């Protein structure tokens, strides 16, 4: 044991000692995993530790699951990779590849997407059937020198004309250009590993010994010479491939092989850029200057650069409406719904099937095909120039033999072998059109399915019962045989179900045989159903409109009936109140106004109310100046009873001409001018019945009853009852012939006469409908005021003989009453202030009753 421990301890101590020695020596520790991990020697414990670490690590990873990339993100990444690859390829191609001084990639004139086939465009440019992408010049001067043209062609800043050109611009061709061209030839041509030896050998034999492709240095092996590695250590697979290829015919060449011609930067002793740009032309579309070797349109022989040519393409697939002649109606209606895409038109003459031809420069530089296709070998452009390597023998300067330069006199067909159309560089236009038609067909089918699902087509339930299984047949049989389905367990009729299955199977078989007919039938049924539904909706809408119109008409009729009933009710109510209505311009209203004025004469109270909206002056006995007792003498006026009521002198009233009182009252109350006679006061001259009212008043004083007229002649709104208004102008109505109050007032006047007092009443023009009014501006100048004094019964002048002949013209019937006339016969005394009586002509119609035609024969004596 002790020996074992000693043997173990030294080993452990040695291990520690070695470890310490390694650390002390400055050398890194052991590199093996077992030396680094002390648990590595213990498999069980170390495995458990690793297992725990794996579980913990896996749990941490599972907590944050990795997000799965979507299809859109993958598409974006793919597009980004392609864009970066295009940029790199563009830079490489500009540095290493060219065709007669032009390039095989676009130069950035247009920034839009390049959706043309780049491989086809590259092939056509190498074959010299389409002009390469020349470097364009924004500006061009005819007097540029050679080194200026070289700088412009290479994209460098244009130096001054007298500036000494740099060596790299106008220097001669470098001696190592052959090595550069040979290295490019090995790098740019198609790899030979993918071709067989026999194919390469046949291709090499097609080249003449004088071809520039064979003018390579001796250090470069021939194209068909195998390398040492392949000759010494050739794999067994290649050996078998060579044996099999010797027996079988060679496979056709998938693509022609590109060859880089010797690099030569000069043509006829001058730089290639100077040779190209010395006669630059401007493209009519992009307005950029290019070498004169541009594409020519096949139709109108106009110049167009390749940058513009590759941008012209067919329009996107669209419906054929409004494009060209109408399509011929075909039996299949679906053909008319197909999308179309017309060929591109010429940008100059707008002729369809746009295509171009190309005349290459007379020299060859850059890339060519080692074995041209038969089409290229026999190709000669429309401008009598060749673009293949089988062209006429080249001169020592590399230029083709000159030929007669002639222009094309006629346009070329779009199918000509020399013409390159826009469809040639975009061969996928037909595939895009088919894809668009397919998408539209799918969309139409989906829309038809949605429409068909929205309606139940007639007759489809019987024809398609087989698709619903056995339960559908059982339901139909139960509906047909209700007696059997009434609770019994009798099985359905097997003959009917089998017949339905046979018919449905036959229908399905016919559908499989003729799907177009079935589809057409379904479309026709759907159209008929949609038409019927449209008609039904139209009829329903029309019925709804008629219902609404009838309802509105009924409402309007009810409304009109209610309105008419309300108007009739109002009219009836007005008729019950007064037989004369509410019109103040009527003859009866004027007669009432006249009666009110006459009544106010006896009562000493005036109420102004005129039909012509003239407001009269109301003068109370307190406002009238009392005359001196004993002035003047009484004069009998018997003519007043005979003159009728032709003038205001025939009325039992007096006038007083107090200028101060009249002017003050006229200033206070200004009347509105009458529309009938704006320069005078309106005295109701159109009312001929006022005189009858005045005569009726006198008749009532001689034995007639005025109570009857007080109830029948009144203002509307009094309801047959008379009421006295206030002197200050209350809106109350009063009777025109209230003789009871008149008798009491006269008795009171008899008492006042004993004390030698007189009441003066103003006889002014008044109206019956207004309490407060104003006189006209000319009333103070045109109206004469008279005063009359009411005397006791011993006065010689009496108002007892008033002509009754005019009473019948008014149509106003006054009832006869018996009253004491001795009380109402006051004495009339004429004062010095009383003016003489004026005839109607002199008065000019200013007094009330001026329209009366009776004559006045009264005379005034003093």
From Swiss-Prot:
Record keywords: Cytoplasm
Comp. bias regions, Basic and acidic residues: 13-24, 551-578, 751-778
Source taxon at top rank: Eukaryota
Polar residues composition-biased segments: 1-12, 201-218, 465-491, 640-676, 688-724, 847-862
Bridged cysteine pairs (disulfide): none
UniProt keyword annotation of rRNA-binding present: no
InterPro entries: Sip5/DA2, Znf_C2H2_type
GO cellular component: cytoplasm
Region feature Disordered, mapped onto this chain: 1-70, 201-261, 380-415, 465-524, 551-591, 605-735, 750-784, 825-862
Amino acid composition bias (Low complexity), ranges on this chain: 380-397, 579-591
Subcellular location per the Swiss-Prot or TrEMBL entry: Cytoplasm
Family to which this protein belongs: Belongs to the SIP5 family.
Function: May negatively regulate the snf1 kinase.
Protein name per UniProt: Protein sip5
Annotated source species: Sclerotinia sclerotiorum (strain ATCC 18683 / 1980 / Ss-1)
Lineage: Eukaryota, Fungi, Dikarya, Ascomycota, Pezizomycotina
Gene: sip5
